[in-house]
Regions:
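A juxtamembrane structural motif centered on a specific transmembrane helix
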Residues: 1-9, 47-50, 55, 356-361, ...
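Transmembrane alpha-helices of multi-pass inner-membrane enzymes
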Residues: 366-376, 381-411
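Aromatic-anchored transmembrane helix interface
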Residues: 62-71, 83-128, 132
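Hydrophobic transmembrane alpha-helices and their immediate junctions
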Residues: 61, 200, 233, 331-374, ...
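Alpha-helical transmembrane segments of multi-pass inner-membrane proteins
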Residues: 118-145, 171-216, 221-233
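N-terminal signal-anchor transmembrane segment
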Residues: 1-52, 72-80, 373-377, 389
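A membrane-periplasm/extracellular boundary helix in multi-pass inner-membrane enzymes
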Residues: 133-135, 235-273, 291
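Long extracytoplasmic/lumenal interhelical loops at the membrane interface
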Residues: 271-331, 353-354
Length: 411
């Protein structure tokens, strides 16, 4: 590995670690954007020096075509007066660019999947540790609710979704950011990595559950339960019968302590007036966006367009909870099929290429991750930007890793 390749790998590792930040920003410095730009430039140079440009172009016909059409749509939208079209296009394509480049870098052995998945684990542990520390400090009443909000704004430049919740007599704080999906989607694969001791894998499972509880998102809780159910099926027969019986007895006996508070939390998150209020916002957005789609159903209103008298964010006004519908508003039905369908096809084709060669539990985990990525934008902003796209990058890297290290994981 030459000096340029070594530098590239250092940038890749730092870039992955930067995903520990809620939005890749710290104290006003866009650390993640800087590292991603370096990654794209250095990765591009390394691939060109491989002298396999024609092979890459032939292999990436779909990606190149989709990129060209997106650039054309962006230019047309900007000419028609949509000043946000450039930002929208950047957010729409940035994760795809990193995804495709990392695919080729690993394929041509310019990047090492083993070290990449280690960096992903360290990054997720940092995210979990940060959430747990904030939770402990809040429970111990060393910090006020408003101070948590202020901390995220000043340190990370983002408005975290916060609320208080009760677990029995404990008053907890829920802190949710756009990148929380990364941990819930990718950590389950580490429960299956036999290079880690059973105690470590059990700890990672517990940390995943704690993290999901702190984030307190309905979607993430259901997703975690899907992964946990599959993991139990996978490991059930491997656990000695006596241990299984003792474990079940302990769970049932301890349910006297935890069952009622947990049920109360679930009722609050899924069926309370708080949940109803959140759903009402989506209903309003749906009505407004559907009316907008009817005005221009085929070609839409242009990249970066939005309903002028109804926005949820001043910095990205084209972003809505009902994200797929907002894409139809901007791109039209034709554009939605071409652009959103094209991006999903890129992700799915490359990930499935490697997933189909792995053991069944990795295949199922991959399908769960892909499924939730496809479903989530129907009711949450979960498609645009670096944070949302990283789960696809992670799924690709992890499946490539399992392919390379199949021996210990085969039946």
């Amino acid at each position: 590995m030459n000096k340029l390749s070594k530098l590239l790998n250092v940038v890749i590792y730092l870039c992955i670690i930067s995903y520990a930040l809620p939005t890749g920003v710290m104290m006003g410095i866009p650390i993640q954007k800087i590292l991603v730009c370096l990654l794209i430039i250095l990765g591009g140079i390394c691939l060109v020096l491989q002298r396999k440009s024609l092979e890459i172009i032939k292999s990436a016909k779909l990606e190149i075509t989709l990129g060209f059409l997106g650039l054309l749509a962006c230019i047309v939208s900007y000419i028609l007066g949509n000043e946000w079209s450039i930002k929208f296009t950047g957010l729409f394509y940035i994760s795809v660019i990193v995804f495709v480049e990392l695919y080729f870098l690993v394929r041509y052995e310019l990047a090492e999947p083993e070290k990449i998945i280690e960096c992903i684990l360290y990054m997720m542990l940092l995210k979990i540790l940060g959430k747990i520390i904030i939770e402990i400090v809040f429970v111990c009443k060393l910090i006020e609710y408003e101070a948590v909000i202020e901390f995220y704004l000043n340190m990370f430049g983002t408005e975290a979704s916060t609320m208080t919740m009760h677990l029995g007599r404990l008053l907890l704080i829920r802190v949710q950011t756009s990148s929380d999906i990364i941990v819930v989607t990718l950590m389950p694969f580490y429960w299956m990595m036999e290079k880690y001791k059973k105690s470590i894998r059990s700890l990672l499972f517990a940390l995943s559950g704690i993290y999901t509880l702190i984030v307190f998102s309905r979607v993430l809780m259901v997703e975690f339960c899907c992964f946990a159910f599959v993991a139990v099926l996978y490991y059930w027969k491997k656990i000695p019968k006596k241990v299984r019986c003792i474990g079940l007895i302990l769970v049932l006996a301890s349910s006297v302590l935890w069952l009622k508070p947990v049920i109360q939390m679930i009722e609050f998150r899924f069926f309370s007036s708080f949940a109803a209020e959140s759903d009402d916002v989506r209903q309003i957005q749906m009505r407004e966006l559907i009316n907008g789609v009817k005005e221009s159903p085929v070609f839409g209103h242009g990249f970066g367009s939005y309903i002028s008298d109804y926005t949820r964010s001043g910095s990205i006004p084209f972003s809505y909870e009902i994200e797929y519908l907002s894409f139809c508003y901007q791109m039209g039905i034709l554009g939605f099929v071409v652009f959103v369908g094209g991006v999903l096809l890129i992700y799915i084709r490359k990930i499935v290429k490697y997933a189909r060669k792995n053991i069944w539990v990795i295949k199922v985990f991959t399908l769960i991750g892909l499924g939730w990525f496809v479903i989530r934008p129907a009711f949450n902003p979960a498609f645009l930007g670096l944070q949302n796209g990283f789960q696809m990058i992670g799924l690709l890297m992890i499946n490539m890793y399992f392919n390379k290290k199949q021996e210990p994981y085969q039946k």
